[in-house]
Amino acid sequence: CDAFLEGHFLLSSGRHSSAYCQMAYLQQYPDKCAEAMKSVADQLRDMEIDVIVGPAMGGIVYAYELARQLGKRAIFTERVDNVMTLKRFAIQPGERCLIAEDVVTTGISSLETKRVIEEAGGVCLGIACVVDRTKADAPSPIDILASAVKLDLPNYLPEECPICREGKLPLVHLGSRKMKEEAKQTL
């Protein structure tokens, strides 16, 4: 489905990479999206989960599809004034919540959703994702419990990016998160 792109990309984490997984391309094919999430759901069937929580934008479709396959409730968090919130839904105290993401590189974005879950009184069990691109020496701060695929793709701090040093490819930001110019430079 052409979701794997090569070039010079600014990731949501602020890191740079020569590879980008444009998961919106997968979402345009419901059968392929369902197939990817089936492999994730199969890894989670014995878990006690009450709610699947998808951070907007990337996690919404995957949370819905995972919840559908597991017979669970699906909700999403979204940004209000650049702060992740639970605007349209509620989590009951003690509900066991699983975060559904499209791609996890550093897990930092998922921390925002974990905070929302815990502030609502829920219990964050971990993350399920389509693509796990975390590094062994830099694991996600939240356990990744299931993924459809694990990819070992390079990513760099901006000041260590060899693509920037080479100066041949422009830096492209394809993600949904609006990043301030100064944040792009310091992350």
Model-derived segments and their meaning:
Residues C1-L187:
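PRPP-associated nucleotide enzymes
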